[in-house]
Design a protein with these regions (language model features):
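C-terminal catalytic lobe of FAD-dependent flavoproteins
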Residues: 290-396
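Dinucleotide-binding Rossmann-like beta1-alpha1 core, especially the glycine-rich loop
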Residues: 48-126, 247-249, 283
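Central helical "cap/lid" subdomain
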Residues: 191-239
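Helical element adjacent to the flavin cofactor pocket in flavoenzyme catalytic cores
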Residues: 139-196
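Glycine-rich FAD pyrophosphate-binding loop
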Residues: 24-44
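Short beta-strand to alpha-helix junction loop
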Residues: 58, 62-65, 91-100, 139-158, ...
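Beta1/beta-strand and adjacent pyrophosphate-binding region of the FAD-binding site
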Residues: 2-15, 32
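Active-site lid/adjacent beta-loop-alpha segment flanking the redox-cofactor pocket in flavoenzymes
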Residues: 231-336
Length: 396
């Protein structure tokens, strides 16, 4: 282990890997990435990995637009493949959400999102397999899609290593040293690294690291399920779907399968990130099937058989680290040189690379490509939290 670094990034998920990647790309001296498990060994590995640009606030939209561009040009921007499939993204709004959707689409278009409104009839002209009786309006983003979270993080880290990153896996952080109101080092189970910059990108463990130096935010945790089914040929032609009327999402999955999960408005399932079952529950699978059948009735002959016709392949669960307003906490804290970069609230994967790029620039004393100052944790005490056209919840 090196004795001194110009920056130490704690956490090897999408936020930490992205920040480390861009710090090394900027030539920010000696950069170390410390990960308790292995890279992408935490919540990022279980991400549904949607790449969408549908947000209500300027900073969220700008980060999502930049993120989508990065995934589309991953070899150049992220240092390697990301498994990005530009299959499009579509959101269904119920009658009570129609006006909000009409209001936010021009805002998104103004910040560069390629998105358009579609009536249910227009949607069904292209995807006639759908049933849309409860849908008032839809929006469609042709440049969005989904990616591979593990491959993305591996590409970011390997690229950073080529630029000199020091990677320490299986290395637990035990403390952060400070003096005169600034960080001076990171204490790990393998030794201490002297540094003047620490980035806390620990996801669900971010609040624990912050408390080591008195930085404490009200983060909550929720277990998030995904279920994967075999489906007939043809489903691979569908985009990623956010189904607001039914509170679920689905998208094509590799090998002729479909991934299904619980969407806005999610019911939180409190969990200990250190001790939970990372499989999925039968109750979750049972709850998703009727929603999938209601939206795509042609799946009924298979999924209505006993044991879902043998189509249930597998399921898994990750952990959301959720802030009060469902936006991440990013920026320097009162302890000089200490930067928060966690609280992704289910958005971290798609905007993580763009956050890492702007945070790295700020750390290096450069103007960030996107102004992320509004993501500072100070917003909670200053009454500057974010809202959404969809109301409270994960649909930011």
């Amino acid at each position: 282990m090196i004795a001194k670094a110009d920056a130490v990034v704690i956490g090897g998920g999408i936020m930490g890997a992205s920040t480390a990647h861009f710090l090394t790309k900027l030539g920010f001296g000696e950069v170390a990435l410390v990960e308790k498990r292995k890279i992408c060994g935490g919540s990022t590995q279980y991400s549904a990995a949607h790449v969408r640009q549908h947000y209500s606030n300027e900073v969220g939209i700008r980060l999502a637009v930049r993120g989508a561009s990065m995934f589309a040009h991953a070899e150049e921007e992220l240092g390697g493949p990301a498994g990005f499939v530009q299959i499009g993204y579509m959101l269904f709004a119920p009658p009570e959400g129609e006006q909000g959707l009409r209001d936010v689409i021009p805002v998104q278009q103004g910040f560069g999102v390629e998105t358009l409104l579609l009536t249910p009839d227009e949607v069904m002209e292209r995807w006639p397999q759908l049933r849309l009786d409860d849908v008032a309006l839809a929006c469609y983003e042709p440049t969005s899609g989904f990616a591979n979270p593990v491959l993305t993080v591996e590409s970011l880290v390997r690229s950073a290593q080529r630029d000199g990153l020091h990677l320490y896996e299986g290395c637990e952080v035990l403390g952060i040293s400070t003096a005169n109101g600034r960080v001076t080092g990171v204490v790990t189970g393998d030794g201490e690294i002297a540094t003047s910059v620490v980035v806390n990108a620990c996801g669900p463990w971010g609040d624990r690291i912050g408390r080591m130096i008195g930085v404490d935010y009200p983060i909550t945790f929720s277990r998030e399920h995904e279920a994967i089914f075999d489906v007939p040929d043809g489903f691979q032609d569908f985009p990623v779907i956010s189904d607001v009327p039914q509170c679920f999402y689905c998208r094509p999955f590799v090998g002729g399968k479909v991934l299904v999960g619980e969407g806005w408005r999610k019911q939180k399932e409190p969990v200990d990130p250190e001790n939970y079952d990372d499989g999925t529950d039968e109750a979750h699978v049972r709850g998703m099937v009727p929603k999938l059948l209601n939206r795509i009735p042609s799946l009924a002959p298979t999924l209505r058989r006993p044991n879902y016709g043998g189509t249930f392949v597998t399921g898994y669960s990750g952990v959301y680290d959720i802030t009060e307003d469902w936006y991440p906490i990013v920026g320097e804290e009162e302890v000089g040189g200490y930067y928060s970069c966690f609280g992704g609230s289910g958005h971290g994967f798609k905007i993580g690379p763009a956050i890492g790029e702007s945070l790295a620039a700020a750390i290096a004393g450069q103007a960030p490509p996107i102004d992320i100052s509004s993501l500072s944790g100070a917003r909670f005490s200053e009454g500057k939290t974010f809202g959404s056209v969809w109301g409270p919840g994960n649909r930011a």
